[in-house]
Amino acid sequence: KDALEHTGFAPK
């Protein structure tokens, strides 16, 4: 999992 998803950015 990317840390981006925690910041609100979901690459999926």
From Swiss-Prot:
Keywords tagged on the record: Calcium, Glycoprotein
Protein name as catalogued: Calcium-binding shell glycoprotein P29
GO MF annotation list: calcium ion binding
Expression tissues: Nacreous and prismatic layers of the shell.
Entry keyword Iron: no
Function statement: Calcium-binding.
Any further remark recorded for this protein: On the 2D-gel the determined pI of this protein is: 7, its MW is: 29 kDa.
